[in-house]
From Swiss-Prot:
GO cellular component annotations of the record: cytoplasm
G2: region residues: 70-74
Annotated tr-type G domain residues: 5-230
UniProt keyword Nucleotide-binding, yes or no: yes
Region of interest: G3: 91-94
Ranges where the record places region G4: 153-156
Location of this chain's protein in the cell: Cytoplasm
Domain of life (superkingdom): Eukaryota
Protein name from the UniProt record: Elongation factor 1-alpha
Annotated stretches, region: G1: 14-21
Its biological purpose: This protein promotes the GTP-dependent binding of aminoacyl-tRNA to the A-site of ribosomes during protein biosynthesis.
A GO molecular function held by the record: translation elongation factor activity
Binding site for GTP: 14-21, 91-95, 153-156
Length: 446
């Protein structure tokens, strides 16, 4: 994988039938890392299964199935290249229960493509109070996705028939909603596409001569390379931990801040486990150092797969190591809670890759969500649309950080009743000092 090109992690989000798989499959198929042999194999299988109308979603279904079977699937299959950048697609399917994954997924995304179905009734369902379009856009914002491209898909639908009026109507309604969330004017490009036929994906569409903007691939190429916080101390939330025969215990995750190097003595919070990092790999290649944005696997000495789990955070034991949390203060915005939230409420928080219940211990004040000005001290409750400063207590060991120091570990979503009821940003953390396990390998390096 050449390091020279910009490297961006891309999340593709949208309502469940917006045509996400087809559009994503199309990009990977045309610009991506799928070799001809694999495509021929998939095409043959598709024809045998009577899915002869083989369109790009099938590619994605096959990749997903292979990915679910094990870790060996080559991550390159999820990559595609443009003139300036290499994109890795972080999957974020649209169903409600996938929103949790999306919270952990988008916290690693540099940019998002929001795919909107333009069909009559379809767009309206997605943008309705119950639809997922709003929730997805909101989550992308809360989770720090700074750049977004809106692809208005299914322009070939019979009810739309490449109509400019429909595109303008959708753009206006969605822009108004996005403005409310972002709190400042932005220039997110809107592009009318057909993920099925490929209109405006790689080439200008002859069916929409009225559209003068760029194609999807050009818009992707124009995205800015995010600034990576290399000079901060290491923080690497674990996504998974594998046991690999002949190699040992391999935690996997994305470097959020700092650098990870072989030979480093790592401390894993919240359990305060310290050991040595033996080697670091990305895309099956050894690295001498991994930097922010890199999705890596690394081997550790003297630990079993049972010692580590998803949600733990790897850090440099000699440079501001990560710790367990006693409590933290957060600004919480309630989005769609049917009732009132009072102190004592203990929903599940999704913060980086951790998924842990936290108690609203004290609602300290109600604040204006735009200016942060205090509106009421110690309110009895908060409800939808309101923002508050809340002192929160994790109900199990958990590692979080203040947003201004380590942004990816300082924002969270509050999940309850199968939906995101609130989002928050952590202002300050009271950390817990504790004795922990130090492996032989780490003691030798002291």
């Amino acid at each position: 994988m050449p390091k020279e090109k910009n490297h961006l992690n891309l999340v593709v989000i949208g309502h469940v039938d917006s045509g996400k798989s087809t559009s994503t499959g199309h990009l990977i198929y045309k610009c991506g890392g799928i070799d001809k042999r694999t495509i021929e194999k998939f095409e043959k299988e598709a024809a045998e299964m009577g899915k002869g109308s083989f369109k790009y979603a099938w590619v994605l279904d096959k990749l997903k199935a292979e990915r679910e079977r094990g870790i060996t699937i080559d991550i390159a299959l999820w990559n595609f290249e443009t003139a300036k950048s290499v994109f890795t697609i972080i999957d974020a399917p649209g169903h409600r229960d996938f929103i949790k994954n999306m919270i952990t997924g988008t916290s690693q995304a540099d940019a998002a493509i929001l795919i909107i179905a333009s069909g009559q009734g379809e767009f309206e369902a997605g943008i309705s109070k119950e639809g997922q379009t709003r929730e997805h856009a909101l989550l992308a914002f809360t989770m720090g996705v700074k750049q977004m491209i809106v692809a208005v898909n299914k322009m070939d639908d019979k009810s739309v028939n490449w109509d400019q009026g429909r595109f303008i109507e959708i753009k206006k309604e969605l822009s108004d909603y996005l403005k409310k969330i972002w709190l400042q004017p932005r220039q997110d490009p809107f592009i009318p596409i057909s993920g099925w036929h490929g209109d405006n994906m790689l080439e200008k569409s002859p069916n929409m001569p009225w559209f003068t903007g760029s194609t999807l691939i050009d818009a992707l190429d124009a995205l800015d390379q995010p600034k990576r916080p290399k000079d901060k101390p290491l923080r690497l939330p674990l996504q998974d931990v594998y046991k690999i025969g002949g190699i040992g215990t391999v935690p996997v995750g994305r470097v959020e801040t700092g650098l990870l190097k072989p030979g480093m003595v790592l401390t894993f919070a919240p359990m305060n486990i310290t050991t040595e990092c033996k080697s670091v790999e990305m895309h099956h290649e050894s690295l001498t150092e991994a930097e922010p944005g890199d999705n890596v696997g690394f081997t550790v000495k003297n630990l079993s797969v049972k010692d580590l789990r998803r949600g733990y955070v790897a850090s440099d034991s000699k440079n501001d190591p990560a710790k367990d949390t006693t409590n933290f203060l957060a600004q919480v915005i309630v989005l769609n809670h049917p009732g009132q939230i009072q102190k004592g409420y203990a929903p599940v928080l999704d913060c980086h890759t951790a998924h842990i219940a936290c108690k609203f211990d004290e609602i300290e004040s109600k604040v204006d969500r735009r200016s942060g000005k205090v509106l009421e001290e110690e309110p009895k409750f908060i409800k939808s649309g309101e923002a508050a400063l809340v002192r929160m207590v994790p109900q199990k060991p958990m590692c979080v950080e203040a947003f201004n120091q380590y942004p990816p570990l300082g924002r969270f979503a509050v999940r309850d009743m199968k939906q995101t009821v609130a989002v928050g940003v952590i202002k300050e953390v009271v950390k817990k000092e504790q004795k922990g396990m130090v492996t032989k390998a780490a003691q030798k390096k002291k």
